[in-house]
């Protein structure tokens, strides 16, 4: 008997991941295709949208041809995608240049131009280099011959979905990452675009679970799909990551540690009083929002540590070594500002520090200091959320920080909240699959689909005594930014 499945496609920065999920939430097959990053100048980060499409086609073909899929039929597809990235196409739907990605920081001047008119926040969000509008202004000012040919702008997963369906849409959870969308009334703020002469280049807006068309017949034939595969809009990677982790209810939160780190807290009510570069976005769950803080160099800091000091050790060995050091790393602190910092400082120029180094410190202390420093940076975001009156009943941890029981307990102790680890972690691709399953009508609500698909494996409770000690170290950590801001600025002046 042929069984129905949905595909969840996650367009990340380093790879595209595609999973096939059945009606019980079982992952039948999973494939991943690597992506090339173009960094031609300092601060630049781009990808070729056509390479996303080619990698997706390759991945779907590989998945469909696998033994596990021999008695399965794909009924629906949805997407998760890296947010903020600017894709601009002409009136034939052809990209006019490479996509400028979320981690591209060339547009600081354009951010200041926006701030001069609107202040520090626009449409409930801080004006930062990562957002889409400053990228638009950079192209407009530096590549006017390209900008004058723009017919519509999209975000990364929207372009990929367009390649499959030949229909253009953008959904709310991603649109709110542009600075051109009002999350309160679910509409484009065209007056903002008019201020900067953006033009009428806005795509139609839809909900994350909205049906937007079918895979085109010619592409379906090429990929080995049936002729009636329904496609659903999808969500930004953080919204889909939250759905894929079961984080969909008020006071539930997500801690995701990848290259960057994210703390995401779900809210049923909009909040306008956030400060310190915390974001407020629409969730992919209807009538739900999430506040989000970002640590730019979370897993990146751990990768740097490994490549620089532990080249021959595995990550597991590094974490085991870190666990052998004392809480507080024997008085050694690390700030993970290797690529600047997003929350709470919004500072692209700040750089990392080790504070308190003595001749007694060991490799184990340095490893633990990096792990603790990453976690303190994530704690910055949690502190801001709590100051605004939003408590968390639990945090589900995914990514690199969920692969170690030591790090999970450390998160519980520093954050002072229950930490959950999932039985099976698929991340944003599972969130995309859930949106497709809900869109197809497999479940009456997203909540019932999440309940069926997502299971918790282990729970870590905070140790109050440990938390009190970490609070003392955190109070010192918190002061490092102000003490080193000018010093690192001076160093960059000399270096540059």
UniProtKB/Swiss-Prot annotation:
Its EC number is 2.7.1.17. Pfam families: FGGY_C, FGGY_N. Substrate binds at residues 83-84. Signal peptide: none annotated. The active site is at 237 (proton acceptor). It catalyses: D-xylulose + ATP = D-xylulose 5-phosphate + ADP + H(+). Belongs to the FGGY kinase family. Catalyzes the phosphorylation of D-xylulose to D-xylulose 5-phosphate. This is Xylulose kinase.
């Amino acid at each position: 008997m042929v069984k129905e499945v949905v595909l969840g496609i996650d367009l990340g920065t380093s790879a595209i991941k595609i999973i096939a999920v059945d009606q019980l939430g079982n992952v039948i097959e999973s494939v991943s295709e690597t992506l090339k990053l173009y960094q031609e100048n300092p601060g630049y980060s781009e990808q070729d949208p056509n390479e996303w499409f080619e990698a997706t086609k390759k991945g779907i073909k590989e998945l469909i041809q696998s033994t596990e899929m021999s008695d399965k039929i794909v009924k629906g597809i949805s997407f998760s995608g890296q947010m903020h990235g600017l894709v601009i196409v002409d009136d034939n739907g052809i990209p006019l240049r490479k996509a400028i990605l979320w981690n591209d920081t060339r547009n600081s001047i354009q951010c200041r131009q926006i701030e001069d008119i609107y202040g520090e926040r626009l449409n409930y969000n801080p004006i930062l280099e990562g957002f889409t509008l400053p990228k638009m202004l950079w192209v407009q000012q530096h590549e006017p011959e390209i900008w004058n040919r723009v017919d519509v702008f999209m975000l990364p997963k929207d372009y990929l979905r367009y390649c499959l369906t030949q229909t253009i849409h953008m959904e709310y959870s991603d649109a709110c990452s542009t600075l051109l969308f009002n999350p309160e009334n679910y509409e484009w703020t065209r007056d903002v675009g008019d201020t900067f002469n953006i033009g009428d280049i806005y795509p139609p807006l839809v909900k994350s679970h909205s049906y937007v068309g079918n895979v085109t017949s010619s592409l379906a034939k090429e990929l080995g799909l049936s002729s009636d595969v329904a496609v659903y809009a999808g969500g930004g990677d953080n919204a889909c990551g939250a759905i894929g982790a079961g984080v969909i209810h008020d006071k539930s939160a997500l801690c995701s540690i990848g290259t960057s780190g994210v703390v995401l807290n779900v809210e049923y009510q909009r909040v306008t009083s956030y400060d310190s570069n915390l974001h407020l976005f629409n969730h992919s769950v209807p009538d739900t929002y999430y506040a989000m803080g970002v640590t730019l160099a979370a897993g990146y800091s751990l990768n740097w540590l490994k490549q620089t000091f532990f080249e021959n050790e595995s990550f597991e060995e590094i974490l085991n070594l870190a666990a052998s050091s004392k809480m507080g790393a024997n008085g050694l602190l690390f700030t993970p500002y290797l690529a600047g910092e997003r929350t709470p400082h919004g500072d692209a120029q700040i750089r990392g520090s080790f504070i308190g180094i003595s001749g007694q410190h060991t490799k184990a202390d340095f490893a633990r200091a990096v792990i603790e420093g990453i976690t303190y940076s994530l704690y910055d975001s949690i502190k801001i959320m709590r100051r605004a009156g939003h408590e968390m009943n639990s945090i589900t941890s995914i990514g690199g920080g969920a692969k170690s029981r030591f790090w999970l307990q450390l998160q519980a102790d520093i954050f002072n909240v229950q930490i959950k680890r999932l039985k099976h972690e698929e991340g944003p691709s599972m969130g995309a699959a859930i949106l497709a399953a809900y869109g197809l009508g497999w479940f009456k609500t997203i909540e019932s689909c999440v309940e069926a698909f997502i299971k918790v494996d282990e729970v870590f409770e905070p140790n109050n005594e440990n938390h009190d000690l970490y609070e003392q170290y955190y109070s010192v950590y918190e002061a490092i930014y102000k003490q080193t801001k000018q010093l690192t600025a001076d160093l960059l002046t000399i270096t540059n």
